[in-house]
């Protein structure tokens, strides 16, 4: 039973050794000798000098492979038998170096350094993710504020928005926006919008710094009251100018933007120079579409829903934006990605199609039809002209901004040509004039006319035709509200209301509505918006939904800017990797598990675990063993005992020595016991214990193998630290000389 257990232990140990590094020394009982006639391969061969032995260096007689055969006739001991430096072995207590390849300790240090760096990097990344996740949860109530100025052709409007993180799972949009202008009550002037506004527009204030201050300061003061004082310095202020400033000369627009920036630099909000700029018509359309679909809960919806197109009618231009399944590649194409949802948009701006510019074009069209225009009257501003879209009894001065390019020699002031308009209402002529203002070929430099009955006459060549459901906002909403029409009213209802208004005398019409700007132009605006939708864009009544006054493109600016800021400072509720969302809890768990595995690998390489976590080491002999018998008092060399780190006061010998022998270091009755009792295993991880009766009985043959004779007297040799390599070599040579 004991030998069976021993066999199992040796089998398990040998199975873990590489095939090329297993010891070639078979076990041979003490005192036995090889049979007569046994071949060299059957004897106790210790291997050639060039082959690494399985015995660990610096323990007892480390490497028997360094012995060479001794020729008694020549009586010369080979030099390699005395000096083992060439094979990296030595009788000294220093370890030999590896003859070939990289030093294992160097390779282990390199692996250890790489693993330490990986552990530090993984730990730092884990700390970052955990801190961001904790900060995000602690910052649920944190909000950022945004102030956006809409610098249009008719005036400057201020909007304030509050942005916070969206934790709802039914949307991929991470931002929740709240407009702080919703609670503002409209003034008695009959404004259609709930907003803070100053007049006139920036385009009317060129070279008028005092006018700019007057237009800006009330907006800043109002915004300060909407935002908590402790959040003023973190509030971002954006000033975006649209078509009114776009049509100015570059020098004039640069002067306006520069002076606006110098005024806003003293405000309590954060405003950068690049945030004061002119945006293109396409950008304005893009912002408007984003704001519309956010408010209708279509933006970032999961699963994806059909979005609405946006028709944003301003004072100078019309912005058209819709989602187009046909991926065209031109200046109107835009791609928007919200979370995992992609939107392919067609967006363009139609300059000159705003409500104010359209009426201006109607005046230009009538001016061209006047015969024999007196230039002196234009210069002096005495020209009088009848307009079919003005109420009877109306008589007033009108500044025509486009008339100067049509009539040479006219008096052009800072804002255009002054013309006196007289009301001459005619509904048929008014409708035809509105349709003429829609047809781009009538007032542009197009060589060929466009028939509005055959194609959309407001679209330039190459622009995609609008399709789908549309929200008509801004100017469309203003006209509907002026006539007290609900959003469900049809375009025919607009025409009916417009005709009724045109039939009224000016004094009656003016008092029938709340005081507001441009009352006289609504007789023209009613047929104009209908003709613009039906003939200009080919959009039917069923495709139109009239939006509220709260839908403005400024919301899109705040939404997109807050998305950039919040994603970089607060962290979002999920992380997208390879188009797959990972919950922060799962990501943190994966990182912790990876760190633990890496630490286990590092401990395996560097043996850096505490001693009580390590597997117990089982050497063949105790440190204080002084006999060749078993530590269990059983006369067998195969019994093992668990190693104990407790010192018994007896040092473990590391070099062979003679105990209880005559003064000569070696005699015929002596024996050598080779023991390895180091704390660490040998290079092949196998513990060896080899003994022989006497060095004097060692027989060498021509092949370099040896065996011991059992006829010699038994005398034990025990290793000691004081025996040097030279003494042992001399003893070996002396013992062989005696045999001769």
From Swiss-Prot:
Extracellular side: 135-581
Biased composition (Low complexity): 708-721
Disruption phenotype: No visible phenotype. Apy6 and dapy7 double mutant exhibits late anther dehiscence and low male fertility. Pollen grains of double mutant are largely deformed in shape and in most cases, the cell walls of the pollen grains are interconnected.
Gene3D superfamilies referenced in this protein's UniProt entry, alphabetically: 3.30.420.40, Exopolyphosphatase. Domain 2
First and last residue of the signal peptide: none
Cofactors (names): Ca(2+)
Name under which the protein is recorded: Probable apyrase 7
Source organism: Arabidopsis thaliana
Species lineage: Eukaryota, Viridiplantae, Streptophyta, Embryophyta, Tracheophyta
């Amino acid at each position: 039973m004991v030998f069976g257990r021993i066999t199992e232990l040796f089998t398990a140990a040998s199975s873990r050794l590489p095939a090329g590094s297993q010891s070639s020394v078979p076990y041979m009982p003490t005192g036995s000798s090889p049979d007569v006639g046994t071949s060299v391969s059957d004897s106790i061969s210790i291997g050639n000098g060039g082959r690494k032995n399985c015995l660990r260096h610096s323990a007892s007689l480390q490497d028997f492979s360094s012995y060479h055969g001794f020729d008694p006739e020549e009586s010369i001991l080979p030099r390699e038998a005395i000096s083992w430096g060439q094979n990296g072995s030595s009788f000294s207590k220093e370890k030999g170096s590896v003859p070939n390849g990289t030093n294992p300790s160097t390779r282990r240090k390199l692996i250890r350094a790489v693993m330490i760096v990986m552990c530090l990097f993984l730990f730092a990344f884990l700390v970052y993710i955990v801190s961001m996740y904790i900060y995000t949860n602690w910052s649920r109530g944190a909000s950022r504020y945004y102030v956006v100025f809409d610098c249009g052709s008719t005036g400057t409007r201020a909007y304030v928005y509050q942005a916070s993180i969206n934790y709802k799972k039914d949307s991929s949009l991470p931002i929740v926006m709240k407009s702080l202008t919703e609670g503002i009550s409209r003034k008695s002037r009959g404004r259609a919008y709930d907003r803070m506004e100053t007049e006139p527009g920036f385009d009317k204030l060129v070279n008028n710094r005092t006018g700019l201050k007057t237009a800006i300061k009330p907006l800043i003061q109002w915004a300060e009251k909407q935002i908590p004082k402790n959040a003023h310095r973190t509030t971002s202020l954006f000033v975006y100018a649209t078509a009114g400033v776009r049509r100015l000369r570059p020098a004039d627009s640069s002067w306006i933007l520069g002076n606006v920036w110098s005024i806003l630099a003293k405000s309590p909000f954060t405003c950068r120079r690049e945030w004061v700029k002119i945006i293109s018509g396409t950008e304005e359309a893009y912002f408007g579409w984003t704001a519309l679909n956010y408010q209708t809960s279509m933006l970032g919806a999961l699963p994806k829903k059909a979005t609405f197109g946006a028709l944003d009618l301003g004072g100078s231009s019309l912005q058209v934006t819709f989602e187009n399944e046909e991926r065209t590649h031109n200046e109107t194409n835009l791609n928007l990605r919200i979370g995992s949802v992609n939107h392919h948009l067609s967006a363009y701006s139609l300059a000159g199609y705003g409500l104010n510019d359209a009426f201006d074009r109607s005046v230009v069209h009538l001016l061209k039809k006047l015969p024999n225009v007196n230039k002196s009257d234009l210069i002096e501003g005495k020209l009088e002209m009848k307009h079919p879209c003005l109420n009877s009894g109306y008589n007033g001065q009108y500044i025509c901004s486009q008339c100067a390019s049509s009539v040479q020699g006219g008096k052009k002031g800072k804002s255009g040509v002054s013309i006196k308009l007289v009301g001459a209402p005619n509904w048929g002529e008014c409708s035809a004039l509105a349709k003429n203002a829609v047809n781009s070929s009538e007032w542009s430099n197009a060589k060929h006319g466009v028939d509005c009955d055959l194609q959309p006459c407001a679209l330039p060549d190459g622009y995609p035709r609008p399709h789908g459901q549309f929200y008509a906002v801004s100017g469309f909403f203003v006209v509907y509200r002026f006539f007290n029409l609900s959003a469900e009213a049809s375009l025919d209802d607009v025409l009916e209301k417009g005709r009724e208004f045109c039939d009224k005398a000016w004094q009656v019409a003016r008092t029938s509505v709340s005081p507001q700007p441009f009352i006289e132009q609504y007789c023209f605006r009613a047929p104009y918006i209908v003709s613009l939708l039906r003939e200009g864009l080919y959009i039917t009544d069923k495709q139109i939904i009239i939006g509220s006054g709260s839908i403005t493109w400024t919301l899109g600016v705040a939404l997109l800017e807050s998305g950039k800021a919040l994603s970089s400072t607060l962290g979002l509720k999920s992380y997208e990797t390879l188009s797959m969302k990972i919950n922060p809890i799962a990501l943190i768990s994966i990182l912790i598990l990876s760190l633990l595995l890496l630490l286990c690998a590092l401990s395996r390489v560097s043996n850096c675990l505490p001693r009580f976590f390590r597997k117990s080491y089982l050497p063949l002999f105790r440190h204080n063993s002084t006999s060749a018998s078993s530590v269990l008092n059983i006369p067998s060399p195969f019994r093992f005992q668990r190693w104990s780190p407790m010192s018994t006061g007896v040092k473990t010998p590391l070099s062979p020595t003679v105990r209880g022998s005559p003064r000569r270091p070696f005699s015929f009755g002596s024996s050598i016991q080779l023991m390895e009792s180091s704390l660490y295993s040998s290079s092949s991880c196998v513990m060896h214990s080899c003994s022989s009766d006497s060095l004097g009985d060692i027989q060498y043959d021509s092949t370099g193998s040896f065996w011991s004779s059992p006829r010699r007297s038994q005398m034990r040799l025990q290793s000691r630290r004081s025996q040097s390599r030279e003494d042992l070599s001399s003893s070996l040579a002396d013992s062989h000389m005696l045999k001769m």
